[in-house]
Swiss-Prot record:
The keyword Cytoplasm does not apply. Keywords: Hydrolase. The lineage of its organism: Bacteria, Bacillati, Bacillota, Bacilli, Bacillales. This is UPF0173 metal-dependent hydrolase Sca_1312. Belongs to the UPF0173 family. InterPro entries: Metallo-B-lactamas (IPR001279), RibonucZ/Hydroxyglut_hydro (IPR036866), UPF0173 (IPR022877), UPF0173_UPF0282_UlaG_hydrolase (IPR050114). It comes from the Bacteria. Coiled coil: none annotated. SMART domains: Lactamase_B. GO terms for molecular function: hydrolase activity.
Amino acid sequence: MKLSFHGQSTIYFEANGKKVIVDPFITGNELSDLNAEDVEVDYIVLTHGHGDHFGDTVEIAKKNNATVVGLAEVADYLSTSQGVENVHPMNIGGKWEFEFGSVKYVQAFHSSSLTNEDGIPVYLGASTGLILEVDGKTIYHCGDTGLFSDMKLIADRHPVDICFVPIGDNFTMGIEDASYAINEFIQPKISVPIHYDTFPYIEQNPEDFKKLVNKGEVQILKPGEEVKFD
């Protein structure tokens, strides 16, 4: 499996001959190394509806005839309002086996909406994290979230190999809460900090996060770099 980070909360992986992107915020993201027009994927998986996660979903889905996996409200919005033909609705607690591996939606503490063409926020259900089981690895993408103790329950049920954890503060956990989550609750083999430096509100030094983490390895990735694992 190839697993790479592409700025903000975007990750990309290839498994079982399928290409998957999570939270494809590319256009308007100065830290992204991707061009939305060039992205070729079979699946798009979304944690929630905010623009810095929903991003280029519609364009990429239509261009590739890709299946978009998201909460029921997100899937309904895409199919009824945006003309996306292939959607797979899910909800928190649910798991589904796809061609590339499985997706399970877990809770996150955050909000979820998208501003439409008229400037009106559209409610898009809950915000979530993801448990991805791919090629024998368990990946926990925390999405956008504050600190909560049931992260331990999630990790107890699904021992985590690789965790993508937000550290930006202001909108999500900051460095202290994120490192606490890793050390006390999730305890993954590898932690990758995400959701920082994209905007002035979330400027952080990931090395400060790395210094506080004492469980597992921390890999600080530049956009386009791959996670290194056995």
